[in-house]
Amino acid sequence: MAETKDQNVLNIIIISDAAGDTAFSNATAAAAEFPNAEINYRRYPFITNLEKLDEVLKEIEKYPNLVIIFSLVKDEMQIPVIKFARDHNIQCVDIFSPVVEAIQQTTHMIPDQKIGAQHSLNQKYFDRISAMEFAVMYDDGKDPKGFLEADVVLLGVSRTSKTPLSLFLANKNLKVANLPLVPETHIPKEIYEIDPKKIIGLTNDPSVLNEIRRQRMIAYGLNPDTTYSSMDSINKELESAQALYKKLGCYVINVAHRSIEETAALILEHLGIDDYAK
């Protein structure tokens, strides 16, 4: 198993015999409680036989600081994952079996271990899969055309929760693109072409950003007192972002001391979307 001194960098492995949406949603919701952690999500969906599972376990051995979250219906698929985690002394979370066991003990019924039984394969389900793929494809302004196709566009300086928010909202069937804001850099013309209502400007308190960025530098073993983490630089970034938000006439949210869920709820309310409808 690969090792690293940087305990703030975490690789969350999601293994599922279906799409893995439930496991992914659990992972992102839990990870939102650790804003200073740099988290890489590695999804392995539709792992339906032992051969595929063995390939996954061999591949993830190279990653450091692992947490495995799995949703596997069949016992024969669960056991190798649990054994792998035990042998490598890593944390492993089964999000499916405890619920099945609780229902079984209460009803005295035997589960049929049918893969995918929990999903209704309707259009809403497939839309959510598509939204997840969209969020990954258009993260960090990778392709400006995504702004025109998105339901929501998130703008914000570094460390304002753009990516976790994108993924959280994608799980609500929303296509989300985001753009990091850096002073004196070009803003894609597409940003000015879209409806301002679907643009969300994210900001933060300078002191909160300062602490987050300092901790990020420390996590990388670097000097925390850099231009990136200086109050002067942070204030300039926030002022530049605020000027853009005013120019666009977009909705602005301060994410300081707010969870991902709280910020997402404000966005859904602004868009007139009932959370439960998604």
Swiss-Prot record:
Q: Which SUPFAM superfamilies match?
A: P-loop containing nucleoside triphosphate hydrolases (SSF52540)
Catalytic activity, as annotated: N(tele)-phospho-L-histidyl/L-threonyl-[pyruvate, phosphate dikinase] + ADP = N(tele)-phospho-L-histidyl/O-phospho-L-threonyl-[pyruvate, phosphate dikinase] + AMP + H(+); N(tele)-phospho-L-histidyl/O-phospho-L-threonyl-[pyruvate, phosphate dikinase] + phosphate + H(+) = N(tele)-phospho-L-histidyl/L-threonyl-[pyruvate, phosphate dikinase] + diphosphate
Q: Write down the superkingdom of origin.
A: Bacteria
Per the UniProt record, which EC number(s) apply here? 2.7.11.32, 2.7.4.27
One GO molecular function term of this record is: phosphotransferase activity, phosphate group as acceptor
- Which keywords does this chain's UniProt record carry? Kinase, Nucleotide-binding, Serine/threonine-protein kinase, Transferase
Biological function: Bifunctional serine/threonine kinase and phosphorylase involved in the regulation of the pyruvate, phosphate dikinase (PPDK) by catalyzing its phosphorylation/dephosphorylation.
Q: State whether keyword Manganese applies.
A: no
Q: Which family does it belong to?
A: Belongs to the pyruvate, phosphate/water dikinase regulatory protein family. PDRP subfamily.
Q: Which Pfam families match?
A: Kinase-PPPase
Protein name in UniProt? Putative pyruvate, phosphate dikinase regulatory protein
Residue spans making up a coiled coil are none
The residues listed in the UniProt record as binding ADP, with positions renumbered to this chain, are G156, V157, S158, R159, T160, S161, K162, T163
Enzymatic class: transferase
